[in-house]
Amino acid sequence: MSFRKLGHHSPSCNFTASPSRIVILFGLLFLLLGCQKEEMDAPKAIAVSPDGSMEVELMTLNLRYENHQENGKRAWKNRVVGIVGMLQREKVEILGIQEGLHGQVADLWASMPEYGFEGVGRDDGKKRGEYTGIFYRKDRFAADAKNRGSIWLSDTPKQAGSRSWGNSFPRLATWVRLSDRSSGQALWVVNIHLDHINQPSREKGVQLMARKLSEMNRDAEPLVWMGDFNAGELNPAVRYLADGIPASGSSKAFPGLLETFSQLHPKDKERGTLHFWMNDPNRQWKVDHIFVSKQAKVLDARIVKSGEPYLSDHFPVKARVRFVK
């Protein structure tokens, strides 16, 4: 038994299933067989929007990396089936994941063959280390082979595994330009995972990706920028994107994006996404964000909360957005 290959950068990576992976696969198979028949049929054509607009269901989710210290309900093999079920219920079309190790991403992709994937392991640019990856529905979007990739948030962004600015670990951002089959519009998607300790690193990381994006997206096509920023809404790294306020060491302001949850729920006090496996709103922090172009209309935005057993130590963040030509 083997898992599929991951990422367009990866050479032929076959995955031999361990006993624990076999248990996971049987659980996922049971979940898939339990779906309604119409959900398992071949993808159907999507009606073209009369006004050329593009409505998209977005989500970002830090998976919590698989490790031997977390057992029982927190073990990956006991969480993955719930995650796949949640993604099916939420009808997610574009998903940004963080912290997923190679086996975790393979488990998800094997259970979601209707999705394409973009991403690499942060340690070697292939399959070692955590992924900051992007899943997208292939029946809805086509990926632009010339505009996709990953960069390391460092002084040497093309060097796999590189780190600078006091990063505790290699950090990276992944992007892909998608073409919407229903409207013909292009959509740039960026997924980022910033450092959890070093503030200068967070600020320099978003600036680096912003510069890269400005070089690629010269036509100012619609943009989604999501991820685990390890920073709240008032943090300079986040405000650089949301308000166009220059971050430390930057002489140029970013054009500014809409933070989807804040757009609809500016005064909601229970907005934490990082919960540390605890049901205590006073000890939860909103570090996971979905940003979109200012021209977009945010139709819905919410934190997908669930009781125990938790899917991760982060709550997923969901947004439904309409982009207009």
Give the location of each predicted region.
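Active-site beta-strand/loop signature of hydrolases that rely on acidic residues for catalysis
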Residues: 56-63, 83-108, 135, 176, ...
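Bacterial N-terminal signal peptides
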Residues: 23-32
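Active site of divalent-metal-dependent phosphoester/diester hydrolases
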Residues: 118-138, 154-158, 164-170, 220, ...
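Short, solvent-exposed loop/turn elements at domain surfaces
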Residues: 65-73, 97, 144, 199, ...
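Bacterial N-terminal signal peptides that target proteins for export
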Residues: 3-24
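Acidic/histidine-rich helix-loop elements
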Residues: 60-81, 153-168, 195-198
